[in-house]
Amino acid sequence: MSLDNVVEDIRDEARARAEDIRQDGQEQADEIVAEAEADAEELLESRKADVEQQLEREREQALSSAKLEAKQARLSARRDVLQRVREQVERELAELEGDRREELTRSLLDAAAVEFEDADEVSVYGRADDEELLSSILEDYDGYEFAGERDCLGGVVVEGSNSRVRVNNTFDSVLDTVWEDNLKEVSARLFDDQ
């Protein structure tokens, strides 16, 4: 075997080995590229899912916020309506006249008088505009006298001279009690709540 043949065999072997190395390198490169593409696709899908979840959370938050604002607006409107109804009732109580006003005032005084059966002197306070009415009613009660004005819609505040008892039977206090006790029913009637 000649030297040229040996050189040629070595070259062929080197070329074959180089081709094997190149093929191995290409296969490894193809695997790396395929893995990178798969990783990139997986990362892209993961990011898309994250973005979708974030968008869904933001949509839900926006919807919840809008619902809350709408509910607050409804509640505010209801409070305004209830306040106007309350003010209308107060106006009507303040404007009561004649027999109806006397009947209610006498009834409130009778209810308060139970607390002062042992009192010698009883002071009765009321609305300035009701002084004449109260003085007339008090003629039927021994030891009771009109003692002055109270800022109220009507009715009476009664105090005994020998006790620390004070009974507030004004239209205002009765309205407060009735309003609180019946607010749910009033609201249901006004707003058709179930």
Swiss-Prot record:
Gene3D superfamilies: ATP synthase, E subunit, C-terminal, F1F0 ATP synthase subunit B, membrane domain
Family to which the UniProt record says this protein belongs: Belongs to the V-ATPase E subunit family.
Keyword match Ion transport: yes
InterPro entries on file: ATPase_E_C (IPR038495), ATPase_V1_Esu (IPR002842)
Compartments where located: Cell membrane
GO BP annotations listed: proton motive force-driven plasma membrane ATP synthesis
Transport listed as a keyword: yes
Provenance organism: Haloferax volcanii (strain ATCC 29605 / DSM 3757 / JCM 8879 / NBRC 14742 / NCIMB 2012 / VKM B-1768 / DS2)
GO cellular component: plasma membrane; proton-transporting two-sector ATPase complex, catalytic domain
Protein known as: A-type ATP synthase subunit E
Cross-referenced SUPFAM superfamilies: V-type ATPase subunit E-like (SSF160527)
GO-annotated molecular function: ATP binding; proton-transporting ATP synthase activity, rotational mechanism; proton-transporting ATPase activity, rotational mechanism
Keywords, ordered alphabetically: ATP synthesis, Cell membrane, Hydrogen ion transport, Ion transport, Membrane, Transport
Job description of the protein: Component of the A-type ATP synthase that produces ATP from ADP in the presence of a proton gradient across the membrane.
